[in-house]
Design a protein with these regions (language model features):
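Transmembrane alpha-helices and adjacent helix-loop boundaries
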Residues: 2-337
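Residue-level detector of alpha-helix boundaries and kinks
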Residues: 33, 122, 186, 287, ...
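A generic alpha-helix propensity feature with a strong bias for hydrophobic helices
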Residues: 42, 99, 155, 164, ...
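Residue-level marker of regulatory loop/turn positions in helix-turn-helix DNA-binding domains and
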Residues: 193, 203, 216, 346-349, ...
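Pre-NBD coupling/linker segments of ABC/ABC-like ATPases
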Residues: 318-353, 459-470
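Glycine-rich phosphate-binding loops of nucleotide-dependent enzymes
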Residues: 351-356, 362-598
Length: 598
């Protein structure tokens, strides 16, 4: 694919995005104008105000749950912070509506940030319990701190925004403002997916371990997502208070957080459009079914259950999957793509070391998985780690990439001590990694998977959209998958998924590439292709440290071999030296494997 072709492809994508944005803005203007100028009954106005303000809060759950995969069972608490800030600000403290709303959003944002900072390392059901506790605590405060919140009696006469002096917005105009806010928030949340932060969130959701090694600050990303979720909760709550002019603690209980969660799950947690759809259904469906009188709640509950059972990804997820099934993505035919710069450092064949490991140990209680290992990897060489199963090879790679903290020892990458750096920081220093068991971001496209690798910290192409796309396509072209860039990664065969994982690592232009059994699970044809790819990488001067049990593969590409057994280094040298070493033959190769190809 030539530069012109890449530009044309990118230009077509940009054109579609601009068209979609134009249509979205047009629909927003028409909807806001309709709400502003069409007389509606008080009943309908209240329903639509509730739906629009709830939808803003539920869009926060799209970010934290749908995009990032973190549970939040306290969205009603953040909603209440915004609501009570507007309610008390405009009544007790005499603030205008807008400053009170800003205060509410700020309080929700701060509360979400603090809660995220202190609890997101827990994850799973522990995080769920923390958010439930926060929700319960805040509900008790709202009910019992009567001097401030007015307790169970609630707050009345909440002021709306004033346009001219004492003229406050009526319900129709206020509804138009809420709908405009919903369209604005929806636009931002929709486009968040295709930003660097959005891809980082989705990577954390799909595979947190791989995300960290690829260069994403997983903890920081989760905290940002949780904070944004709380911010939108507070924003929606503030607008809600202005819409109804009365609030009380029983509107913001744990049960309401469950309602918010149900809304996002029914509509489809990974799509803002699905979120709005789910919110509308849960608010409007009971009203539509009221003609059934005594049985309408049973019908309503049954409808919700059926949606959850038969559409586990929500209504919008079901529709999207059906659309992709009926309209599979088409491949584009690449021409000549500019060669991939495998590394942005100046290649040096002077024998200097890119990696120095000194007395490295990793103990799990009494088990010495890695025990005082010394390792030196020369620049622009292929260094193989071999040994029997359980010898500590993968554990060593996990320590090198920061997944495990060493018990003792030192790791230097390109003359920088990285022993105590986090995985994403080591990626920023130029360390790339693949896994024995393929770890891709399963719900992202192939090109987005590789783009995450290219956006590692300190990478020269990160943040430059056109150059980033060209670089990512070049990485895919290097492994032979450029024509499938826009397909779902889950549609690929096992062997092709292995190539995508390698392309993701290459896209980061690593100084050192760690490959953990890249040939595992491949058939003969795929393995021959892998050998050819590794030879090309070696020919480009990329420094590689590889683990593999296929000695034919190792002999063909390795310049140096280190052998581990029971966590200790037992041999090291050229393939000819190591594979004839009696200790290696006895520990790993067996007596029948003593000849080495010239």
């Amino acid at each position: 694919m030539t530069t012109e072709t890449v530009t044309t492809t990118a230009g077509g994508t940009v054109g579609r995005i601009r068209l979609g944005n134009t249509l979205y803005v047009a629909i927003a203007i028409i909807t806001v104008a309709f709400a502003n100028f069409t007389p509606l009954s008080a009943y309908v106005l209240n329903l639509l105000m509730q739906a629009s303000t709830y939808a803003i809060a539920v869009l926060g759950l799209t970010i934290v749950l749908g995009y990032t995969g973190q549970i939040n069972l306290a969205q009603a608490a953040f909603f209440s912070l915004g609501a009570y800030s507007v309610a008390l600000g405009t009544t007790t403290f005499g603030l205008p509506f807008m400053p009170a709303l800003v205060l509410g959003v700020a309080l929700a944002c701060i509360a979400g940030g603090v809660l995220g900072l202190t609890s997101l390392r827990l994850g799973g059901h522990y995080l769920a319990m923390v958010t439930i506790s926060f929700q319960t605590m805040l509900s008790l405060i709202l009910t019992n701190w009567v001097a401030l919140t007015r307790g169970p009696d609630g707050v009345t006469n909440i002021k709306r925004p004033a346009l001219f002096g004492d003229y406050f917005l009526d319900s129709g105009h206020y509804l138009a403002m809420c709908i405009a806010a919903l369209f604005g928030v929806g636009f931002l949340v929709w486009h968040l997916r295709k930003t660097r932060l959005g891809r980082a969130m989705q990577a954390v959701r799909d595979n947190e371990l791989a995300a960290g090694v690829t260069g994403i600050n997983t903890y920081g990303t989760k905290v940002v997502a949780f904070t944004l979720s709380a911010l939108l909760g507070g924003f929606g709550g503030g607008l809600f208070a202005g819409g109804f002019s009365y609030i009380s603690p029983d509107q913001f209980t744990f049960g309401e957080s469950i309602v918010f969660l149900t809304m996002v799950l029914i509509g489809g947690s990974r799509s803002p459009l699905g979120t709005v759809l789910g919110t509308g259904l849960l608010i409007l469906l009971p009203e539509w079914l009221r003609f059934l009188k005594n049985v309408y709640l049973a019908v309503y509950g049954g409808a919700v259950i059926l949606i959850m059972v038969f559409m586990p990804d929500g209504i919008w997820g079901f529709v999207t999957a059906l659309w992709h099934k009926l309209n599979p993505p088409t491949r584009f035919t690449p021409g000549a793509i500019a060669p991939l710069p495998l590394t942005h450092e100046v290649a040096r064949a002077d024998g200097s070391l890119i990696l120095r490991v000194t007395s490295l140990s990793k103990h799990f209680g009494g088990l010495k998985a890695v025990d005082e290992v010394d390792l030196a990897v020369a620049r622009n060489t292929v260094h193989a780690l071999i040994g029997p199963n359980g010898s500590g090879k993968t554990t060593l790679l996990n320590v090198l990439s920061g997944i495990y903290w060493p018990t003792a020892g030192c790791i230097e990458l390109d003359n920088h001590d990285v022993t105590r750096l986090q995985p994403y920081q080591r990626a920023g220093c130029g360390l790339g990694r693949t896994f024995q068991n393929i770890r891709l971001f399963g719900d992202m496209s192939i090109i987005d998977n590789v783009m995450v690798g290219a956006e590692r910290p300190n990478h020269v192409v990160a943040g430059h959209a056109a150059g980033l796309i060209r670089h990512v396509l070049a990485a895919l072209d290097f492994v032979g998958l450029a024509d499938r860039a826009y397909e779902a990664v889950g549609s690929l065969s096992y062997g092709h998924q292995r190539l995508v994982e390698i392309a993701r690592a290459l896209a980061g232009s690593p100084k050192l590439l760690l490959l953990d059994e890249p040939g595992a699970g491949l058939n003969h044809v795929e393995k021959d292709g892998l050998v050819g790819l590794l030879k090309r990488l070696k020919g480009h001067g990329l420094t590689i440290c590889i683990i593999d049990h296929d000695m034919d593969l190792v002999e063909q590409i390795a310049d140096h071999i280190t052998v581990l057994n029971f966590g200790r280094r037992i041999a090291g040298g050229t393939p000819e030296e190591v594979l004839r070493d009696p200790k290696v033959v006895a520990a790993y190769l067996g007596e029948g494997r003593v000849d080495v190809s010239p």
